[in-house]
Curated annotation (Swiss-Prot):
This is NADH dehydrogenase [ubiquinone] 1 alpha subcomplex subunit 2. The modification N6-acetyllysine is found at residues 64, 75. Acetylation of Lys-64 and Lys-75 is observed in liver mitochondria from fasted mice but not from fed mice. It comes from Mus musculus. One of its GO terms (molecular function) is NADH dehydrogenase (ubiquinone) activity.
Length: 99
């Protein structure tokens, strides 16, 4: 619980406003993202209840993680062909400001 509180504080200090995940419902390149959502989304949302985390599915789209910060700044991380564990690490990097 303390780790979740610490990561919430870190995200707030970085000015993180929103996370968006884009993925394809069927493509093999999005499989790790789909697995991440099934296995870890609920835990992530519980750890960050006030952070909007948007999941967007679209046919043939390349899987990406978008982080929107204060003053309209955005960072993009490709999630193509990553495993669920690698997607988790990418998400942790965004939440800690390393992305």
């Amino acid at each position: 619980m303390a780790a979740a509180a610490a990561s919430r504080a870190v995200g707030a200090k970085l000015g993180l406003r929103e996370i968006r995940v884009h993925l394809c419902q069927r493509s093999p390149g999005s499989q790790g993202v789909r697995d991440f959502i099934v296995q870890r989304y609920v835990e992530l949302k519980k750890a960050h209840p006030n952070l909007p985390i948007l999941i967007r599915e679209c046919s043939e789209v390349q899987p990406k993680l978008w982080a929107r910060y204060a003053f309209g700044q955005e960072k993009t991380v490709s999630l193509n062909n990553l495993s669920a564990d690698e997607v988790t690490r990418a998400m942790q990097n965004v939440l800690s400001g390393k992305a």
